[in-house]
Amino acid sequence: MVKTQRVVITPGEPAGIGPDLIVQLAQREWPVELVVCADATLLTDRAAMLGLPLTLRPYSPNSPAQPQTAGTLTLLPVALRESVTVGQLAVENGHYVVETLARACDGCLNGEFAALITGPVHKGVINDAGIPFTGHTEFFEERSQAKKVVMMLATEELRVALATTHLPLRDIADAITPALLHEVIAILHHDLRTKFGIAEPRILVCGLNPHAGEGGHMGTEEIDTIIPVLNELREQGMKLNGPLPADTLFQPKYLDNADAVLAMYHDQGLPVLKYQGFGRGVNITLGLPFIRTSVDHGTALELAGRGKADVGSFITALNLAIKMIVNTQ
């Protein structure tokens, strides 16, 4: 790495395990400076609850970034709206969570930070606070004014991107248009090259219907939409294999010769990945003008403050972000 970079982290829901995981991250050295966008008392109280050392250093944007030493974090302060009781949601803190996301996103957009790693949020409490919120992916897409973003989850062995994300099943077929597929595949191909350092990405594409439509007998979306788009993109030089039945595609004979899978909808691709690598998976938002990774689990309110939260996914998310920073330099 040419110079030390700053990575901004949001802990997510303050009553959940996010703050626990941040404190655990701080127990090791990192080659980047970790800037945590959070309430100071929240972090120090959680560290005391876990019996772990933590020193918070003030964020100084005009000073050179320094590698993070064990037991320390750099703090970019955002104040809680309500005091936190571990494991109990407080509606007003939905505003606090969104403030941390907004500040972190803005810092990436203005060049303060080289990447953003997000902890788990509770979508329900944010909406209960009167803030329409469907997820990190959509929030960062809107705030960064990105034309289109793509959700991808990854482990060391498997990357799965989604053509559609948080849609009811009844709406998915109508959402999968030629324009959407062109855009999603272009973003996936571009970011595999630029952020993952893969010179010629090989992408497996799932069909939408059982048996990938069985030649039109189980749905015609493959014939009408997916196959024509793949043929057009192959003519541009992209290495695309599909559409393949999802129950066939996730086998070593296909995956061993691919860099990523494109699933048509959320529950088509993610159950396989989460079964294969739960606790080690990372959520990545492709198409943003900055690097964003996230844990692949929820807030686990029942584990907060008990020292039982597994920091593995957060470590993987941070390590992947660091690799992506190197690839883009």
From Swiss-Prot:
One Pfam family it belongs to: PdxA
GO-annotated molecular function: 4-hydroxythreonine-4-phosphate dehydrogenase activity; cobalt ion binding; magnesium ion binding; NAD binding; zinc ion binding
Enzyme class: oxidoreductase
Positions bound to a divalent metal cation: 166, 211, 266
Domain of life assignment: Bacteria
Needed cofactors: Zn(2+); Mg(2+); Co(2+)
Biological process (GO), any one: pyridoxine biosynthetic process
Sequence positions that bind substrate: 136-137, 274, 283, 292
UniProt subcellular location: Cytoplasm
Annotated EC: 1.1.1.262
Major place of residence: cytoplasm
Free-text remark on how the cofactor is bound: Binds 1 divalent metal cation per subunit. Can use ions such as Zn(2+), Mg(2+) or Co(2+).
Pathway where it operates: Cofactor biosynthesis; pyridoxine 5'-phosphate biosynthesis; pyridoxine 5'-phosphate from D-erythrose 4-phosphate: step 4/5
Reaction(s) this enzyme catalyzes, per UniProt: 4-(phosphooxy)-L-threonine + NAD(+) = 3-amino-2-oxopropyl phosphate + CO2 + NADH
Annotated Gene Ontology cellular component terms: cytoplasm
Keyword terms: Cobalt, Cytoplasm, Magnesium, Metal-binding, NAD, NADP, Oxidoreductase, Pyridoxine biosynthesis, Zinc
Protein purpose: Catalyzes the NAD(P)-dependent oxidation of 4-(phosphooxy)-L-threonine (HTP) into 2-amino-3-oxo-4-(phosphooxy)butyric acid which spontaneously decarboxylates to form 3-amino-2-oxopropyl phosphate (AHAP).
Family under the similarity heading: Belongs to the PdxA family.
UniProt subunit comment: Homodimer.
Additional notes on this entry: The active site is located at the dimer interface.
Database matches in NCBIfam families: pdxA (TIGR00557)
Protein name: 4-hydroxythreonine-4-phosphate dehydrogenase
Annotated gene: pdxA
